[in-house]
């Protein structure tokens, strides 16, 4: 009964308004009030401040500064072997596995299409047909910067407006097409083992999604799909990111989805739904093909 009420509220609440309000408040320098909120949040969610570059609450002028706090050097060693992909974020794996007939598993009994996730781009979706996917959920207590699983050259970025449903196991099991409905930023990279998608999915009170090459992507929320393309590897202005390098961040929230082409990676066998992830640990083993182009 309680779960039914929570899901019903997801449809009734003014999610856009709540998100704007949360984003506004999280970016304000409110002195003692900001410190009170940060300390209460850290205690409630058991945030490990000893991993932070600056463990003192007083170092953070706004809640957003605290939320996207960098980690101290060496806190997340990145797997060194060239053929191994690294976890992109701290969190927990929601689902992972093979993309069957263009469908991704959201939760037991719920699938959604890769084409819908990729904003209806059927040509892009075809690149990941029968490939592999990994969905990583970032809890409030987690480190909220997102990193590269491997070296890659940025091919394109797509901003997709959408709903702002909360993302958690309850909504994943009860809101159809959750990740294909929510606001998201799709980043497509060319790698030595083929294309890779890294998708940052928004949620209720996720005030901002940012990338290191373009800054804040949302807000503003203009309600239209936006697309950016970038030079190929070796061309002037090409954007190349290395394994373990930061590529984006959430203020606040949410979820990272990775897509890989068929036969190009083998997901680490120890991973399953519910596995806790730490950025830099092994995600998969790559099967090299050709240099990115």
From Swiss-Prot:
Recorded topology in the membrane: Peripheral membrane protein
Domain of life: Bacteria
Keyword S-adenosyl-L-methionine: no
Reactions catalysed, as given in the entry: a 1,2-diacyl-sn-glycero-3-phospho-L-serine + H(+) = a 1,2-diacyl-sn-glycero-3-phosphoethanolamine + CO2
Any one Gene Ontology BP term: phosphatidylethanolamine biosynthetic process
EC code(s) of this entry: 4.1.1.65
Pyruvic acid (Ser) PTM positions: 254
Enzyme active site: 90, 147, 254
Cellular compartments annotated: Cell membrane
InterPro entries cross-referenced by the UniProt entry: PS_Dcarbxylase, PSD-B, PSD_type1_pro
Protein name: Phosphatidylserine decarboxylase proenzyme
Organism (species): Yersinia enterocolitica serotype O:8 / biotype 1B (strain NCTC 13174 / 8081)
Name of the coding gene: psd
């Amino acid at each position: 009964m309680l779960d039914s009420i929570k899901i019903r509220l997801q449809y009734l609440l003014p999610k856009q308004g709540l998100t704007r309000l949360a984003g506004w408040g999280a970016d304000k320098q409110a002195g003692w009030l900001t410190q009170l909120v940060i300390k209460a949040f850290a205690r409630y969610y058991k945030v490990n401040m000893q991993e932070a570059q600056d463990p003192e609450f007083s170092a953070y002028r706004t809640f957003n500064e605290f939320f996207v706090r960098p980690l101290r050097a060496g806190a997340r060693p990145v797997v060194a072997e060239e053929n191994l992909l690294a976890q992109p974020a701290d969190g927990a794996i929601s689902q992972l596995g093979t993309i069957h007939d263009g469908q991704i598993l959201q939760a037991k009994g719920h699938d959604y299409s890769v084409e819908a996730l990729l904003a209806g781009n059927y040509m892009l979706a075809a690149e990941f047909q029968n490939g592999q996917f990994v969905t990583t959920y970032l809890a409030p207590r987690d480190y909220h910067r997102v990193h590269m699983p491997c070296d890659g050259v940025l091919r394109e970025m797509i901003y997709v407006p959408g709903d702002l449903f909360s993302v958690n196991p309850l909504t994943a099991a009860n809101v159809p097409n959750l990740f294909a409905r929510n606001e998201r930023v799709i980043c497509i990279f060319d790698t030595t083992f083929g294309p890779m998608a890294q998708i940052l999915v928004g949620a209720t009170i996720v005030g901002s999604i940012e990338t290191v090459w373009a800054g804040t992507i949302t807000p503003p929320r203009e309600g239209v799909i936006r697309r950016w393309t970038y030079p190929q590897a070796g061309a002037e202005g090409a954007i190349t990111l290395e394994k373990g390098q930061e590529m984006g961040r959430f203020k606040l929230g949410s979820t990272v989805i990775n897509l890989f082409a068929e036969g190009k990676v083998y997901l680490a066998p120890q991973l399953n739904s519910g596995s806790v992830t730490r950025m830099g640990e092994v995600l998969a083993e790559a099967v090299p093909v050709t240099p990115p182009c």
